[in-house]
Amino acid sequence: MGFNINIIGTGGTRPLHNRYLSSVLIEYDGDNFLFDCGEGTQMSLRKQKISWQKIKMICITHLHADHITGLLGIVMLMSQSGETRKEPLIIAGPVGIKNYTQANINMLKIYKNYEIIYKEIIIDKTEKIIYEDKTKKIEYTKLKHSIECVGYLFIEKDKPGKFNTEKAEELNIPKGPIRKALQDGKEILVNGKIIKPSEILGKSKKGLKVAYITDTGYFKELIQQIKNFNLVIIESTFKNELKKEADKKLHLTAGGAANIVKQAKVLQTGLIHFSERYTLRKDLENLLKEAKLEHPDGEIFLTRDGMRLEANKNNFIIK
């Protein structure tokens, strides 16, 4: 339970022996949300002892192979793991995600004993919120890449403050559903008097905001979308010396990623989606150095396969 983030993979283009393709799983009070699903994702999930059966929703950023080729394996395994899913699997992504998935299911004759709900995103037209319940919501944000691509914003809703039982007794508010309504932020009517939640509840706790941003080139609009986020996991594909290549391919350098989060005043930043050319630890450490040179006051770190981050007040602790 709680609010945790598991780094499933951190690479780009192709998996390496010690680095799977970029993928992140967010756990929130028993609900699991997977962001991107490249080749080898199921292997990394298995290594981290994370059940794919517990994945509620898979959010794909774009239809490039290194972000999607692991999807069908997980779709198949959900029907072959010895237990039946009790709820549908939600799959979200840009237009084409449904055709890609269904065509492969049909062509490969994949046995499936559960429902899939597709949420295809038509950028700038589809409602920004693609998932919402009482405690959280997921929004998409447009990215700048060679094909239609979106980032995802995981937003925890503000939590109500402490319920003042003495005040409730004083105002003759009966126990039960009517008190629950106040805790849900609704006004109630007691003895002809309207009572607002603010009269009974203490100060609310601000919810945490997490963004998953890859693949993209630099563009100013992104800064506003992740303004003041608690944690942004953002691509850092190239070293600064390859800025021309990054700009051409619509990717970010380490310095470019740091510049974005600096302007957005992000609290914590995790770098991800490292080029396959960076195979040594020192290569990745150089990416981190370049990011910190651009944003020396920022809390920036390298993500790694198997890393786990746990929510703690207004930030995340690396485990």
Swiss-Prot record:
EC number(s) per entry: 3.1.26.11
Keywords of the record: Endonuclease, Hydrolase, Metal-binding, Nuclease, tRNA processing, Zinc
Catalytic activity field: Endonucleolytic cleavage of RNA, removing extra 3' nucleotides from tRNA precursor, generating 3' termini of tRNAs. A 3'-hydroxy group is left at the tRNA terminus and a 5'-phosphoryl group is left at the trailer molecule
Broad class of enzyme this protein falls into: hydrolase
UniProt binding sites for Zn(2+) 2: 66-67, 215, 273
Catalytic machinery residues: 66
UniProt cross-references to SUPFAM superfamilies, sorted A to Z: Metallo-hydrolase/oxidoreductase (SSF56281)
Residues where Zn(2+) 1 binds: 62, 64, 145, 215
Any one GO molecular-function label of the UniProt entry: 3'-tRNA processing endoribonuclease activity
One protein family per Pfam: Lactamase_B_2
Cofactor: Zn(2+)
Similarity remark: Belongs to the RNase Z family.
NCBIfam families found in the cross-reference section: PRK00055.1-3, RNase_Z
Protein role: Zinc phosphodiesterase, which displays some tRNA 3'-processing endonuclease activity. Probably involved in tRNA maturation, by removing a 3'-trailer from precursor tRNA.
Subunit structure, interactors included: Homodimer.
Protein name as it appears in the record: Ribonuclease Z
Taxonomic source organism: Borreliella burgdorferi (strain ATCC 35210 / DSM 4680 / CIP 102532 / B31)
